Amino acid sequence: MEYERRGGRGDRTGRYGATDRSQDDGGENRSRDHDYRDMDYRSYPREYGSQEGKHEYDDSSEEQSAEIRGQLQSHGVQAREVRLMRNKSSGQSRGFAFVEFSHLQDATRWMEANQHSLNILGQKVSMHYSDPKPKINEDWLCNKCGVQNFKRREKCFKCGVPKSEAEQKLPLGTRLDQQALPLGGRELSQGLLPLPQPYQAQGVLTSQALSQGSEPSSENANDTIILRNLNPHSTMDSILGALAPYAVLSSSNVRVIKDKQTQLNRGFAFIQLSTIVEAAQLLQILQALHPPLTIDGKTINVEFAKGSKRDMASNEGSRINAASVASTAIAAAQWAISQASQGGESTWAAPEEPPVDYSYYQQDEGYGSSQGTDSLYAHGYLKNTKGPGMTGTKGDTSGAGPETSLEGGTDSVSLQAFSRAQPGAAPGLYQQSAEGSSGQGTATNSQSYTIMSPAVLKSELQSPTHPSSALPPATSPTAPESYSQYPVPDVSTYQYDETSGYYYDPQTGLYYDPNSQYYYNAQSQQYLYWDGERRTYIPALEQSADGHKDTGASSKEGKEKKEKHKTKTAQQIAKDMERWARSLNKQKENFKNSFQPISALRDDERRESATADAGYAILEKKGALAERQHTSMDLPKLASDDRPSPPRGLVAAYSGESDSEEEQERGGPEREEKLTDWQKLACLLCRRQFPSKEALIRHQQLSGLHKQNLEIHRRAHLSENELEALEKNDMEQMKYRDRAAERREKYGIPEPPEPKRRKYGGISTASVDFEQPTRDGLGSDNIGSRMLQAMGWKEGSGLGRKKQGIVTPIEAQTRVRGSGLGARGSSYGVTSTESYKETLHKTMVTRFNEAQ
């Protein structure tokens, strides 16, 4: 706190022109090389030498100091120190003083109670908070004694260390040990309070332990501190309130990083202080707290903003590694899910196909706590053989993993645990009976979905779902479905991950795809979707299996109607995409090459969730996800193109019509009509849902995006010959059209226009040069002659009263350029009215006469 007396200019001259008699400056430089700004008095040296005691201070200064203490005690405030600033040479008061309080609350209460003013010995004094120290780029800080030196000093004011040595970065422990941080007294920088009593013992560390603990961050020490693991809903006021007992900060010192879309903070904030010493002291205080610093129920991690990278590895697995694993596994998941959902007609892979090991995807990832169980797609997973975390063999319906059990008429799928625990979330069980139809008779089969609690952290590799051919007869009893309920996902807490392009959910450990609105579990390599009615995450694989059953049940009705629906396999879709990519490269147009046609779902098919299907989202993101991967890797084919592929559950339930002759015979309007779901009022081509039928029709008629997607959809079903013809037509349209040449060829070249007629007819007389009328002399008909005749002048007489002037008019003569008046050869008697021939003749005559 600063008390400044509003006196005259002479009372405050000591602040700017005082001399400095310290021994380290020598006898040559006796004047102080700075302007004595109102910096914090705690940065002033405490011992000024023996000269300090020689001055006899006046009684008024002592009375002022006692008056300040008396007023503080009358208000019940005990100040830690009251220091009146004096001139070192004269001992006179410099007109201001500092009052240090024990707590920030006492200083604030004192300022508010006195309204920033005080009466001392009949003099009105204004009170202000002490100003911060000069900026670090103006003055330099001594790392040995901690004194702030002015920028023009070549050595430290207190300890005499040269500037080059004092500015070298020392270990943080050495600097903090030499400061008075554990003492909680005067050597603290501005804005920081002393260490509380319980934490002073923690601050007094040995130099070895402190240097070892702070060595990584001391190399990157700066004046900015970062706070990590903030609550997304934490505000600036909550951060300032949590740091109020340890530092005097304002909103200008704290910067909270917010998300542009949600306007919530992204989990971290920066605190910028005036100097590195203040940042180091505040960092030491916050790191020494036991229990650690908490803001809005979240434990905060504090470190230098530009410190070394932290070791992100933890017991439950690295989040960054999980993100890279997720982005690497997506391409393989396209083929694995399609192979896993074939149904009862096919197995996981052909027995004669050579074994393929996909464990190289996990190379150098270190994902999770174990290496064997965390492989993305191990050989046992694809081949239905024994693998890490699996106890069953191929064809064995009972020997499943520890989390998988098969009973009569029940398919049990256990979803692996989420990667992070959610405290206090005890999910309940939600049971719902599901009835299905089989081809042999009317019976009910139930499926049990068991989604483990987020509190479970151990991940185990699950065995794949057995095909429907392994189910017992249709006389199995009915069992209810059990689901684990979870809170509604909070999108505001999601964090964007650049490696995978997904949003990471810190509560469940899942990765969210905003385009397809599906969740990806990096541990179980499964896609999930949120079911609002069941309040749980449902695997997309099971959803596709249900759709496959419904498709098989409704196939008989289709046969009765003599209508056979073709399906696209993954290989056919890949061929369509390659053909479409070739046409785009030829046209050099920027179309989206990851389009896949979608067929409208029939009313009697299975009731799906509000989100899009996982199979379409996976196949659509094939090209985009391949570009996101850091290392390009080719996926081996799981099945040969020559072998006819049976219908697959995931693709057969949601894919469009196949590229066959039967499809080509159908009309374009019929195929385009299937791209609209009138029941749900959704455009399946643009993947948009509308509130009313009128809005959907208006979208189809006016939307440019719909027209562009429709053109892409039409081109995707054209043959190669039609594409070439269309390409040739487009190239012809892109050529330059010379419309002027077309007009000349059609109408001919027009005749040039006739010249404009003159306003006055007849041939005009030849123009006479303006000097020609005076060539033969001036006549008596000019205006000058008439004016002279009016004044009594007669032709042949001279000018003047007595006719003594010139008789003939003065004629203009030409002289040589650059010659002076009267110089020899300057004039040859040539006038401006003479022609070139006459001028040349006179010049030659004049030169001849001068030569003689």
Swiss-Prot record:
The modification N6-acetyllysine is found at K306. Residues 1-78, 343-365, 386-410, 426-446, 459-489, 542-568, 634-675, 740-783 are annotated as: Disordered. Residues 1-14, 21-45, 545-561, 665-675 have a biased composition (Basic and acidic residues). Keywords: Acetylation, Metal-binding, Methylation, Nucleus, Phosphoprotein, Repeat, RNA-binding, Zinc, Zinc-finger. A zinc finger (RanBP2-type) spans 135-165. One of its GO terms (cellular component) is protein-containing complex. Residues 430-446 have a biased composition (Polar residues). Gene3D superfamilies: 3.30.70.330, Zinc finger, RanBP2-type. GO terms for biological process: 3'-UTR-mediated mRNA stabilization; cardiac muscle cell myoblast differentiation; mRNA splicing, via spliceosome; mRNA stabilization; negative regulation of cell growth involved in cardiac muscle cell development; negative regulation of cell population proliferation; negative regulation of mRNA splicing, via spliceosome; negative regulation of ribosomal large subunit export from nucleus. SMART domains: G_patch (SM00443), RRM (SM00360), ZnF_RBZ (SM00547). Its main location: nucleus. InterPro entries: G_patch_dom, Nucleotide-bd_a/b_plait_sf, OCRE, RBD_domain_sf, RBM10_OCRE, RBM10_RRM2, RRM_dom, Znf_C2H2_type. Residues 780-826 form the G-patch domain. The modification Phosphoserine is found at S61, S640, S645, S655, S658, S660, S703, S719, S767. It is found in: Nucleus. A zinc finger (C2H2-type) spans 681-706. GO terms for molecular function: identical protein binding; miRNA binding; RNA binding; single-stranded RNA binding; zinc ion binding. Residues 463-484 have a biased composition (Low complexity). Associates with the spliceosome. Component of a large chromatin remodeling complex, at least composed of MYSM1, PCAF, RBM10 and KIF11/TRIP5. Binds to ssRNA containing the consensus sequence 5'-AGGUAA-3'. May be involved in post-transcriptional processing, most probably in mRNA splicing. Binds to RNA homopolymers, with a preference for poly(G) and poly(U) and little for poly(A). May bind to specific miRNA hairpins. This is RNA-binding protein 10. It comes from Rattus norvegicus. The gene is Rbm10.
